[in-house]
């Protein structure tokens, strides 16, 4: 039985994990942590966990990593809004611990990333723009998923990522991200490839949070026998594909 520590247990994602965990017979929630707890409580939290799923806030990440290193506790990080300093901490810790980070753990969003990478190879002379839509209370903008998608495409094509274009014209070597906030929208991401004569749009819409938490729990299980490294959801899919071949 895998003991999973849940960081961010009182948030929307945490509550959904608690509601879905019984569907998985080989793991259980062994410890919980939320933003009202004392940060030093992370010591026992990590001690009582084989792996931690973190859907909390960037502010606790450094202490969470420190205690995870102390107790050799694996990490699945789904918290968004991380800054470059946080990724440096993850990269350093991943030399000692297996860590999986993803801004979006749903199968559909990661398939969208894969398809976008393939499409931009074929449609080499098309302009690329990303539009993301979320509920009115989402704190970070653009979304972590939009940044993930943009970075995947930018690496493939050597583009610059632009968040706020303002009143200047679009340059040739850029990919733009635009954000909408309103209503109770869970998550919509659209990648538009715009040519002179046609437009192709790739779209993923999450109807609820179930796909995110199922991906997170599966990631925690997958991470159990892995060596120290910083993994992504693509590593899980690549590993599964290799086993099938």
Curated annotation (Swiss-Prot):
Name used for this protein in its record: 4-hydroxy-tetrahydrodipicolinate reductase
Organism: Rickettsia akari (strain Hartford)
Gene: dapB
Binding site for (S)-2,3,4,5-tetrahydrodipicolinate: 135, 144-145
NCBIfam families per UniProt: dapB (TIGR00036)
Pathway assigned in UniProt: Amino-acid biosynthesis; L-lysine biosynthesis via DAP pathway; (S)-tetrahydrodipicolinate from L-aspartate: step 4/4
Enzyme class: oxidoreductase
Family, similarity comment: Belongs to the DapB family.
Active-site residue list: 134 (proton donor/acceptor), 138 (proton donor)
Subcellular location: Cytoplasm
Catalyses which reaction(s): (S)-2,3,4,5-tetrahydrodipicolinate + NAD(+) + H2O = (2S,4S)-4-hydroxy-2,3,4,5-tetrahydrodipicolinate + NADH + H(+); (S)-2,3,4,5-tetrahydrodipicolinate + NADP(+) + H2O = (2S,4S)-4-hydroxy-2,3,4,5-tetrahydrodipicolinate + NADPH + H(+)
């Amino acid at each position: 039985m895998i003991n999973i520590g849940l960081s961010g247990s009182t948030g929307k994602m945490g509550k959904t994990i608690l509601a879905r965990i019984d569907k998985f017979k080989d793991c259980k929630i062994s410890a919980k942590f939320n933003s009202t707890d004392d940060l030093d409580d992370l010591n026992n939290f990590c001690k009582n966990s084989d792996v931690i799923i973190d859907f909390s806030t960037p502010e606790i990440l450094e202490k969470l990593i420190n205690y995870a290193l102390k107790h050799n506790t694996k990490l699945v990080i789904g918290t968004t809004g991380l800054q470059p300093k946080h990724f440096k901490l993850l990269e350093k810790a991943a030399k000692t611990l297996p860590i999986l980070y993803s801004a979006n753990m749903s199968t559909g969003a990661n398939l969208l990333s894969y398809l976008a990478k393939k499409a931009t190879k074929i449609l080499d002379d098309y302009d690329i723009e990303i539009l993301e839509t979320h509920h009115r209370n989402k704190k970070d903008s653009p979304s972590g998923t939009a940044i993930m998608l943009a970075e995947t495409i930018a690496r493939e094509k050597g583009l610059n990522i632009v968040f706020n274009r303002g009143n200047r014209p679009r340059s040739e070597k850029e990919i733009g991200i635009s954000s909408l906030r309103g209503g109770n929208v869970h998550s919509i991401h659209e990648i538009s490839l715009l040519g002179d004569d046609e437009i192709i749009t790739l779209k993923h819409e999450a109807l609820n949070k179930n796909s995110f938490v199922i991906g997170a729990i599966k990631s925690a299980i997958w991470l159990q026998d892995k060596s120290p490294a910083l993994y992504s959801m693509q590593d899980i899919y690549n590993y599964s594909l290799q086993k099938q071949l």
